Amino acid sequence: MKIVEVKHPLVKHKLGLMRENDISTKRFRELASEVGSLLTYEATADLETEKVTIEGWNGPVEIDQIKGKKITVVPILRAGLGMMEGVLENVPSARISVVGMYRNEETLEPVPYFQKLVSNIDERMALIVDPMLATGGSVIATIDLLKKAGCSSIKVLVLVAAPEGIAALEKAHPDVELYTASIDQGLNEHGYIIPGLGDAGDKIFGTK
């Protein structure tokens, strides 16, 4: 599995600010979107382009235009919505597929409760967005749903990832690509990432 830890100074700086315990909801939300945008820049670096001719200010001009598979952004509810706008800043024409998944706090297993995928998802590249890759359960279950629907080109974008989640994802879906702003130390006894970001969903939606 391709694993990319984005080490750009801007990414590291913004993620560091997100780790502050007393960060405001507004600031956390802004930074989640900004880091999501920077991760998208990395994840789409291999998109193919083609030459097309358009009418410029002084006559015809040849430009590069993205070709090939179109994109669907797949936020995992609810926290994934915090990264979605940042992704769409780079790929504004992308369609949105939504997957609702929550983690059973006792078993740590993912529980699906909603899904709405674009109709032609088999023709698109999916960018799954979720702030945390902890045990990997929610992301793995989401990929299962996408593959069942016919999607074969899948990339995962997360703010922070635990080694345990990376290992589980690689075992379940070695053909996907993972882009993260940080590979953190690991999980605590409650299944939360250390040092992590705390509860990203609560911080994005102001419910902490």
From Swiss-Prot:
Its cofactor is Mg(2+). One of its GO terms (biological process) is UMP salvage. One of its GO terms (molecular function) is GTP binding. Binds 1 Mg(2+) ion per subunit. The magnesium is bound as Mg-PRPP. GO terms for cellular component: cytoplasm; cytosol. Uracil binds at I193, G198, D199, A200. It catalyses: UMP + diphosphate = 5-phospho-alpha-D-ribose 1-diphosphate + uracil. Allosterically activated by GTP. The keyword Isomerase does not apply. Signal peptide: none annotated. Its EC number is 2.4.2.9. Keywords: Allosteric enzyme, Glycosyltransferase, GTP-binding, Magnesium, Nucleotide-binding, Transferase. Pathway: Pyrimidine metabolism; UMP biosynthesis via salvage pathway; UMP from uracil: step 1/1. It is an enzyme of class 2 (transferase). 5-phospho-alpha-D-ribose 1-diphosphate binds at R78, R103, D130, P131, M132, L133, A134, T135, G136, G137, S138, D199. Belongs to the UPRTase family. PANTHER family: ADENINE PHOSPHORIBOSYLTRANSFERASE (PTHR32315), URACIL PHOSPHORIBOSYLTRANSFERASE, CHLOROPLASTIC (PTHR32315:SF4). Catalyzes the conversion of uracil and 5-phospho-alpha-D-ribose 1-diphosphate (PRPP) to UMP and diphosphate. This is Uracil phosphoribosyltransferase. The lineage of its organism: Bacteria, Pseudomonadati, Pseudomonadota, Gammaproteobacteria, Enterobacterales.
